[in-house]
C-alpha cells in the first residue's frame, strides 16, 4: 500500500510545536486594517493554539 501524503494546504496554515501542540495565525489581519482598532490588530498578532475539536482532524491531514 502506498504512503499517505500529508495535506499540503494544511501544512502551510499550521505548525506543530516541539511538545506536539498545533498553532496557527489568527484570522483578520490580511486586509481592511485601517478601519480596525489598533487594539484589535495587536490582539490578533502572534500564534494561537488550534481549538481542541479540530486537533484530531488536523493531525490526520498532516499524517501524524
Curated annotation (Swiss-Prot):
GO biological process, one term: translation
Basic residues bias locations: 1-22
Keywords: Ribonucleoprotein, Ribosomal protein
SUPFAM superfamilies, alphabetized: L35p-like
Matches recorded under InterPro entries: Ribosomal_bL35 (IPR001706), Ribosomal_bL35-like (IPR021137), Ribosomal_bL35_sf (IPR037229)
MF annotations from Gene Ontology: structural constituent of ribosome
Region of interest: Disordered: 1-39
Family matches, as NCBIfam families: rpmI_bact
Identification of the protein by name: Large ribosomal subunit protein bL35
Source organism: Salinispora arenicola (strain CNS-205)
Gene: rpmI
